[in-house]
From Swiss-Prot:
Enzyme class: transferase
Gene that this polypeptide is encoded by: rsmA
UniProt xrefs under SUPFAM superfamilies: S-adenosyl-L-methionine-dependent methyltransferases
Catalytic activity line of the entry: adenosine(1518)/adenosine(1519) in 16S rRNA + 4 S-adenosyl-L-methionine = N(6)-dimethyladenosine(1518)/N(6)-dimethyladenosine(1519) in 16S rRNA + 4 S-adenosyl-L-homocysteine + 4 H(+)
Species: Synechococcus sp. (strain RCC307)
Localization per Swiss-Prot or TrEMBL: Cytoplasm
Protein name: Ribosomal RNA small subunit methyltransferase A
Length: 274
């Protein structure tokens, strides 16, 4: 057997998805076409890999950190010419996937302890988006993170991450995934999300994007305080209320009450003073 005697390792955050219906929903959400090259992060024992290879996708390019799993994956898919495997840390590799056939989509059950850095690697930041963007990312993440990504202004889970991701991609929930669908089961609820990165002409201009990042760091460092206080250092106090009004905001609003596009308007209004 390819993976005989291998058990999930806590230090790698390994929780292998075993539910066939969830695996199928993940692949269906990716809407794979014959010209798609798929990047899979953390294939584990290959349950999702097998479903991806059963799709029309042109290739599946997987990245696995656990060297003990690499040999098993190579053995399991030895007869599949569309399968390629990189051994290494997805956060450290200089290039993801085949250099000649850049992945067009990402499908992955990612280790929850690297969700933030991995999202930055795959989608980018407002001031440094990944170029060219992937067409779609279908990711299995901790439900708390999924809710933060899709949260709207005024909701308790709305955060700087919500603003960043909503300005970089169309985000939607695919399905919740309970712990029983994994081996071993995690102690948290999970969710499949789909992200469609926005083209450059639908994202904030680079100069404004940098200002949005700056304002998010200031405001969400004290998310319960009014922006009149948290943004006081961003511009002269005498002009701050005028700039807030220009962006359609009031000094009494708190960061979690300001929608993603309002942060863009605020950054554009404050830009000359930053």
């Amino acid at each position: 057997m390819a993976f005989s005697g291998h058990h999930a390792r806590k230090r790698f955050g390994q929780h292998w998805l075993k539910d066939e219906s969830v695996l199928q929903r993940i692949v269906a959400a990716a809407a794979l076409q014959p010209d798609d090259h798929v990047l899979e992060v953390g294939p584990g024992r290959g349950a999702l890999t097998a479903q991806l290879l059963a799709s029309p996708a042109a290739s599946v390019q997987a990245v696995e950190l656990d060297r003990d799993l690499v040999a098993g994956l190579q053995q399991r898919f030895a007869a599949e010419p569309r399968f390629q495997l990189q051994s290494g840390d997805v956060l450290a590799l200089p290039q993801l996937g085949d250099g000649e056939r850049r992945p067009t989509k990402v499908v992955a059950n990612i280790p929850y302890n690297i969700t933030g850095p991995l999202l930055e690697r795959l989608v980018g930041r407002l001031d440094r988006p990944v170029e060219p963007p992937y067409q779609r990312l279908v990711l299995l993440v901790q439900q708390e993170v999924a809710r933060r990504i899709s949260a709207r202004a005024g909701q308790s889970s709305f955060s700087a991450l919500s603003v960043r991701m909503q300005l970089l991609a169309h985000c939607r929930s695919v399905c919740p995934v309970p712990p029983r669908c994994f081996q071993p089961p995690p102690k948290v609820q999970s969710e499949v999300i789909s992200l469609d990165p926005l083209p450059a002409d639908q994202r904030p201009p680079q100069a404004v994007a940098k200002q949005v990042e700056h304002l998010l760091r200031l405001a969400f460092s004290a998310r319960r305080k009014m922006v009149r206080n948290t943004l006081a250092s961003a511009a002269p106090a005498v002009g701050l209320e005028v700039w807030l009004a220009d962006a359609g905001l009031t000094p009494q609003q708190r960061p979690q009450e300001i929608a993603a596009q309002q942060w863009v308007a605020l950054a554009a209004a404050l830009q000359p003073a930053l």
